[in-house]
């Protein structure tokens, strides 16, 4: 779908054009504004409150119209703190929805929900803006061909492949490598697909947003020396923001991603961390607007809000937006309406395991819990499907045998089971991989492994051709040839020690 970017922001230019109203009521982040008869703003129009508070400080608050209440009154939700606002203050109707800067100038920069840069690097050098509210692409514009989105990470491409233009849920607690995996994907899409990424921080910790920015600069994903060569744009609406900002920041990030897809015709990665906070903010806004709550106190419009965001994330004939969304599961209850509504939209799930992270196997993707709708013979081909299933079966059998090994030891197993365990341990280590963005921590150069190479490697392990190699030869290597070379080096080293 072609976007219709404008070349000016929705701030009204001349005094005659200004549609002025006055604040009638303030309820936290919600404002009621009275306009002259016949001058009512449309739903989703941006309103701007400008003035001074009681101590003379300049106030500039942008709001979004949510309801038309009748009697020339509208109800709007503020995108920033409403401290210092007073009844009777003048409100300007901009006559258009919130619009944000789009295009190459956004790369390497950090924005808030309004598209204003918050990184102290000066204004954004672009006159092209786009409204955050747009309809999803029409059916005729969609690219319905099912194709794999190759990430270069062995465990993902083999066992839970991503769909081009699909939506992936990323599950994992603190410290299991979510951020590093996200940064590696940003790096790989730029190198292998010539694509860019947009990161939407929705309602998460400000410290995490800052850490991510610093780590991206350190790993080269954001190029400080030449900001235009950066591979990602960052949009933050963190925990301290009002619910209106947290509810809309996902749309701001999505709008920037849509421009890269529709106008620049690129493959785009859109990260949303965390999709649950988008629902949570919508729930807060819904209560403030006086709507009757639905199940578990969520907003009655939960499915509609989620659908309007998710349906814009898709492949068109121009390009694709592939979305990776971190999903927080409240109280580990997968039947909670928020995660349950999210699951309906996901094509794949990538589950990060603390047990694997503790073993030092990175990326710590759980091969048995991670799933994908793409892993079907008619989509990925018979060879890929069979290899993935055999890897899972071997890993599952190893998991079942672990209790017996812990109690009786490896010697009590049958010959066949011992062989299964040996191959499963090689597979477990071969699923690890050195990352480009982790070179600064590991000292090992990063590896991008193509899908064909990945399948070949696991087939050789499963067939028994590599049974003679030590399992440590498979740890943190790229393709299977590197594992063979590493085994030879280990053999030489052991002989020298003797």
UniProtKB/Swiss-Prot annotation:
GO cellular component: chloroplast thylakoid membrane; mitochondrion; proton-transporting ATP synthase complex
Broad class of the protein's primary localization: plastid
Record has ATP-binding as a keyword: yes
Enzyme class name: translocase
Catalytic activity: ATP + H2O + 4 H(+)(in) = ADP + phosphate + 5 H(+)(out)
InterPro entries given in the database record: AAA+_ATPase, ATP-synt_VA_C, ATP_synth_F1_bsu, ATPase_a/bsu_AS, ATPase_alpha/beta_chains, ATPase_F1/V1/A1_a/bsu_N, ATPase_F1/V1/A1_a/bsu_N_sf, ATPase_F1/V1/A1_a/bsu_nucl-bd
Membrane topology: Peripheral membrane protein
EC number: 7.1.2.2
Pfam families, per database record: ATP-synt_ab, ATP-synt_ab_N, ATP-synt_VA_C
Disulfide bonds: none
GO biological process, one term: proton motive force-driven mitochondrial ATP synthesis
Keyword tags: ATP synthesis, ATP-binding, CF(1), Chloroplast, Hydrogen ion transport, Ion transport, Membrane, Nucleotide-binding, Plastid, Thylakoid, Translocase, Transport
KW Thylakoid (keyword) present: yes
Protein's cellular compartments: Plastid, Chloroplast thylakoid membrane
Residues bound to ATP: 172-179
Single GO MF annotation: ATP binding
Family stated for the protein in its record: Belongs to the ATPase alpha/beta chains family.
Subunit details: F-type ATPases have 2 components, CF(1) - the catalytic core - and CF(0) - the membrane proton channel. CF(1) has five subunits: alpha(3), beta(3), gamma(1), delta(1), epsilon(1). CF(0) has four main subunits: a(1), b(1), b'(1) and c(9-12).
NCBIfam families registered for this protein in UniProt: atpD
Function: Produces ATP from ADP in the presence of a proton gradient across the membrane. The catalytic sites are hosted primarily by the beta subunits.
Name recorded for this polypeptide: ATP synthase subunit beta, chloroplastic
Organism: Caryota mitis (Burmese fishtail palm)
Gene name as annotated: atpB
